[in-house]
Regions:
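An N-terminal assembly and electron-transfer interface module characteristic of large anaerobic redox
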Residues: 1-188
Length: 188
């Protein structure tokens, strides 16, 4: 079984988590390519005008995965609890993808801490959908969490190293990871 990961939006925050999780479950993983002008054009074609640029890019990445995998992962995130609500696009993307690409098999998971949908619970549900036991899914999730923590440390160390350099002027750009790390919109 092959799981497609769109290289956009939350991928830049949770890519290591997702890739490790699915590989630990014995799935093949295909990640869409770096964002290109064609990715953006495809995303614009399949989006309404009012969608933000990152959402249009996301749709282009989803389009690029159709026919290349058994499922495309499209997470639904309503909120992390308390004052950690997220932009509505993270709650809506799953429905938008399903309604736009009717032939695509979407694998989703829901996170809504206030509604009792934790990340662990969501991953256990995905494992069941993929026909995996709860024990194997839990083991895969734990390994994936460790991989994501290592990736977070690596990125933090790179940022600290860049900021500690003494040569020349530094300009700090504060943005969402899906803007900063995207090759098309996050680079000069």
């Amino acid at each position: 079984m092959t799981i497609g990961l769109p290289r956009a939006m939350l991928f830049y925050r949770y890519g290591a988590l997702w890739e490790t999780f699915f590989k630990e479950l014995g799935c093949d993983v295909v990640i869409s390519g770096e964002t290109s002008r064609q990715t953006l054009c495809d995303g614009i074609k399949y989006s309404i005008d009012e969608c933000c640029l990152p959402s249009k890019i996301y749709m282009g990445h989803v389009y690029s995965l159709i026919g290349r995998c058994d499922y495309i992962l499209v997470p639904r995130v309503a909120g992390y609890g308390g004052k950690n609500d997220v932009c509505v696009k993270f709650n809506a993307l799953c429905d938008i993808v399903r309604n736009t690409f009717e032939t695509a098999r979407v694998l989703d998971y829901n996170i809504d801490i206030a509604g009792g949908e934790t990340e662990l619970r969501a991953f256990l549900r995905m494992g069941l959908i993929l026909g995996k036991s709860a024990a194997r899914t839990l083991s895969a999730y734990r390994k994936a969490r460790l991989a994501q923590a290592a990736e977070d440390r690596r990125k933090s160390e790179l940022q600290e190293k860049a900021l500690s350099r003494r040569d020349g002027m530094k300009i700090l750009i504060v943005s969402h990871p899906y803007n900063n790390y995207d090759r098309l919109i996050g680079r000069p």
